[in-house]
């Protein structure tokens, strides 16, 4: 029997799915976590066209924007990691309303220059903003007053190259992956108090003592399949599914690889998972128990798969771009490639899909708008901004919100069909 909390959570997700342009973008990849929206986004823009406002963002942070109730929230950090903060920008004007210092580490852990000290994306739910900086700290802030409601700095992890996994909400919990050089676990915190509700260590045989090969930067996903709700949480070497209420392990699959960052997707009764190395990309039937490596893998695909950019599923197709700019369309059911197209540019941002159009931001300032066309690669527009994107785009109304390495933009124009 579905409990009331889960029923309420399902209603929230369904409301976000059907709300169209009015939906709030409350977590990494939006309210449903898959980078899809019914908003009528602009097709073309530049520094001098269709930019409603442009706000400078000092510091170095790759966290994606989130939005609720007319406020855009961004995790931020100084380049040296000595100040970790939460920035609030008015969605209507681009004005910075708050810049809240959350943590000031005296001796920040090492962060690889390609990463940042503020790469995990915040979550907004129930009038609270949850901000996560890996082991440097996790905090809850009142969206209305900006007051810090609680904070934690006692969740250990040597990220070795900086944090990357974003927190996700589930009912009254906040769930976070910690897959580090030294320890690997998943933890659920009470949203109201920050206390630990459950913590489950990874049960993966990594086959090595090298902590660098145990790292992962993935954001998990929660869904219900055949009446069973599950938290699918990729790690290095394997992916584990847990009961999101208790942390009990349900199933796991060994696929090799490490440094996974792209968020998994659930569609057509399959979970699509990818990682760097190993099997690279695979689809798993999520109805098993225990080790399902030999029994529940539907297909594998290993050519030009991404490490960082999360994919999008539109209809029966999976669309993706890899880190080096190779676009691919696969059939979700079979894993068969329908087409592949090589373009220029390096990519970290997740794909955003709106009404059959894929918005693909690269690290040099170009955003390609590509049709979700299963028959061929179809470029609809190519748009340039002054600086590139490590963060993934967000949606406010029928506008795009893009965080580049230097600025935050709200991009809008005539509604597209």
Residue map of PLM features:
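Mature extracytoplasmic/luminal segments of secretory-pathway proteins
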Residues: 7-8, 215
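Noncatalytic, solvent-exposed loop/strand surfaces
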Residues: 20-417
């Amino acid at each position: 029997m579905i409990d009331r909390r889960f029923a309420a959570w399902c209603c929230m997700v369904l409301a976000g799915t059907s709300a169209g342009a009015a939906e709030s973008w409350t977590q990494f990849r939006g309210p449903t976590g898959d980078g899809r929206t019914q908003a009528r986004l602009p097709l073309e823009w530049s520094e001098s066209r269709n930019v409603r406002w442009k706000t400078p963002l000092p510091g170095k942070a790759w966290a994606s924007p989130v939005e609720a109730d007319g406020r855009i929230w961004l995790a931020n950090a100084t380049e040296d990691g000595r100040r970790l903060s939460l920035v609030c920008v008015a969605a209507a004007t681009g004005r910075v309303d708050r810049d809240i210092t959350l943590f000031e580490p005296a001796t920040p852990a090492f962060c690889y220059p390609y990463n940042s000290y503020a790469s995990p994306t915040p979550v907004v739910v129930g009038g609270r903003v949850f901000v996560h900086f890996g082991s440097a700290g996790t905090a809850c802030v009142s969206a209305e007053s900006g007051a810090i409601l609680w904070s934690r700095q006692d969740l250990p992890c040597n990220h070795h190259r900086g944090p990357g996994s974003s927190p996700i909400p589930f009912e009254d919990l906040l769930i976070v992956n910690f897959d580090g050089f030294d320890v690997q676990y998943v933890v659920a915190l009470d949203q109201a108090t920050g206390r630990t509700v459950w913590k489950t260590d990874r049960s993966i045989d990594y086959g090595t003592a090298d902590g660098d090969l145990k790292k992962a930067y993935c954001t998990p996903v929660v869904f219900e399949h055949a009446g069973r709700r599950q938290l699918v949480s990729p790690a290095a070497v394997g992916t584990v599914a847990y009961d999101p209420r208790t942390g009990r392990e349900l199933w796991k699959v060994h696929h090799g690889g490490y440094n996974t960052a792209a968020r998994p997707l659930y569609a057509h009764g399959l979970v699509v998972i990818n990682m760097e190395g190993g099997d690279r990309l695979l689809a798993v039937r999520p109805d098993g128990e225990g080790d399902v490596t030999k029994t529940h893998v539907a297909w594998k695909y290993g050519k030009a798969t991404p490490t960082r950019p999360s994919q999008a599923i539109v209809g029966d197709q999976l669309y993706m771009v890899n880190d080096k700019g190779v676009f691919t369309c696969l059939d979700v059911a079979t894993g068969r490639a329908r087409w592949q197209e090589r373009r220029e540019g390096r990519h970290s941002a997740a794909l955003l899909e709106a009404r059959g159009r894929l918005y693909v931001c690269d690290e040099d300032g170009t955003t390609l708008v590509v049709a979700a066309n299963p028959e061929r690669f179809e470029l609809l527009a190519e748009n340039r901004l002054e600086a590139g994107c490590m963060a993934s785009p967000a949606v406010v109304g029928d506008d795009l919100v893009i965080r580049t390495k230097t600025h935050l933009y709200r991009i809008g124009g005539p509604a597209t069909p």
